């Protein structure tokens, strides 16, 4: 009797294994550092140092085993997953990885940014599979979003997000196209330092263009760069946006004698952005916020 029971059980187990193998897939992704990374799908254990806001849109919390400590202060993540601090361990950040904590989590994939290649090499030496991202345009952001859709089998959700983002961008574009080129404002985006400006590369430059502005710092073919105060004064921007994570505020620029000759200061057209991610679907909301200024 036991033999008759064991036989069908063995067949079921064999069929399950065959189905699992058939569903398994490997994709090759060339990341921002030019590395070709082979990734086995579906990813079941992932650590996010970056692009963690996208997990909220995709609803893949059961696949996230570790996260950047900065995620603990993210308003979106705290709203959709109030228990994030208790349920998802921090593994440091892309700047300072806690390698012991990371290895304990046994991730199948680590998603980080390309800013720190040495840290990426260090993680790889420890046997971890790492993808380095740094979207430098809206088009590249869409590529990153589609990659994560593939990783977790959420392609339809990603396309839905992209469709909604495009609708917002189209709405902004329709309004801004009515402004003649000669009347478009010069707009700069400041980073962590008061003289750190966003150049031609990066989503910030795309945001300025979408909002109907002209980025004079786009002559710099960089993501961001420290420039002299004299150069900022020469650009004489009409509007200034400050990165939401900067340690200084609008009042600091308005009170500075160095900035007093800049048009944006005189007209009080200086705004500090909300701390919303620009490597996520919330980029569209940031663009809308900028266009309304």
PLM-predicted stretches and their roles:
Residues 98-112, 228-245:
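Proline-aspartate-enriched helix->loop->beta-strand connector
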Residues 116-125, 242-256:
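A ligand-binding cleft/hinge motif common to bilobed small-molecule-binding domains
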Residues 1-24:
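Secretory targeting signatures
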Residues 47-105, 109-115, 216:
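A short, structured surface patch at a secondary-structure boundary
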Residues 197-224:
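Alpha-helical, coiled-coil/dimerization segments enriched in small aliphatic residues
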Residues 26-27, 36-38, 118-196, 217-219, ...:
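Extracytoplasmic substrate-binding proteins
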Residues 45-48, 65-68, 109-113, 130-134, ...:
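Structural recognition of the beta-strand scaffold that forms the well-ordered cores
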Residues 32-34, 88-100, 136, 220-229:
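Short helix-initiation/N-cap motifs at beta->coil->alpha
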């Amino acid at each position: 009797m036991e033999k008759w029971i064991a036989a069908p059980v063995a067949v079921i187990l064999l069929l399950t294994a065959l189905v699992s193998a058939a569903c398994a897939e490997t994709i090759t992704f060339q990341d921002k550092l030019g590395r070709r990374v082979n990734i086995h799908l579906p990813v079941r254990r992932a650590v996010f140092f970056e692009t963690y806001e996208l997990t909220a849109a995709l609803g893949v919390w059961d696949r996230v085993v570790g996260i950047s400590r900065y995620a603990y202060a993210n308003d979106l993540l705290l709203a959709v997953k109030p228990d994030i601090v208790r349920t998802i361990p921090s593994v440091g950040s892309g700047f300072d990885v806690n390698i012991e904590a990371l290895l304990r989590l046994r991730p199948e994939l680590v998603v980080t940014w390309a800013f720190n290649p040495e840290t990426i090499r260090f993680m790889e030496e420890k046997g971890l599979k790492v993808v380095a991202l740094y979207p430098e345009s809206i088009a590249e952001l869409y590529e990153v979003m589609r990659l994560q859709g593939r990783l977790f089998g959420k392609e339809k959700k990603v396309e839905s997000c992209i469709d909604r983002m495009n609708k917002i961008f189209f709405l902004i574009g329709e309004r801004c196209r009515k402004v003649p080129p000669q009347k478009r404002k010069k707009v700069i985006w400041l980073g962590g330092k008061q003289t750190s400006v966003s150049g031609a590369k990066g989503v910030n430059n795309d945001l300025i263009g979408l909002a109907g502005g002209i980025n004079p710092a786009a002559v710099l073919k960089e993501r961001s760069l420290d420039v002299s105060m004299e150069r900022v004064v020469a650009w004489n921007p009409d509007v200034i946006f400050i990165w939401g994570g900067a340690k200084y505020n609008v009042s600091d620029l308005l009170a500075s004698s160095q900035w007093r000759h800049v048009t944006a200061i005189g007209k009080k057209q200086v705004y500090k952005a909300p701390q919303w991610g620009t490597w996520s679907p919330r980029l569209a909301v940031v663009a809308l916020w900028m266009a309304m200024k």
